[in-house]
Amino acid sequence: MSASKTGLWVVDQRPMRVEQMMFTDEMNRELENLQDNKLKRVTIVGSRGIGKTLFAQALADFQGLVLKVSELENTPIQHTEAIILKGIDQQPNAEILRIAERAEKTILIAQEDISERTDKSNSFHAVNLEELMPKNQKSFEKIKNYLLGVLDQNQIQFQIGDLQFQLNIEELFDKLWPNMRQIVRQTQMRAKPGEWVSIPV
């Protein structure tokens, strides 16, 4: 987990290993497939807060340089480094390809699919992260177990058998999935006094 201390779980406890992450079975399979095929150019697509950057970091074995497009000009990039570039949606084709040539592995993060904007000979494999996060019982069990671990880690007291607690976890999933950032934020908001405070459902 990250060493910085902001008081925000979503920042302070950002996973630094795959084992610490909330991955669906579909995400695990896709990650293994991408790693097995040793793909060097990947675009990860999805809405805000669902974990695109974390998935990209896992793909780069947490060794990638994470940059926003605005930081490119002032950041030296070693050719051997993996670069994870955020905010790529508005970049023109030529700029995307120029960026790709600056690193051994290039992972682009976008909110929309940009694969059709890149030259066929330099195409990026697109991964739609939301498609790997189905809203089903398996995904619910994954997020529930992840949140129980987060609560334990933060020494938050809760009664796992309490009906309201169970309903609150289900409600977080129903209303916010697949926005992992918001799920963790809302979990922290319900645990401010050191114990879980259920909101009647």
PLM-predicted stretches and their roles:
Residues 60-70:
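Post-Walker A helix-loop "phosphate-sensing" segment adjacent to the P-loop in P-loop NTPases
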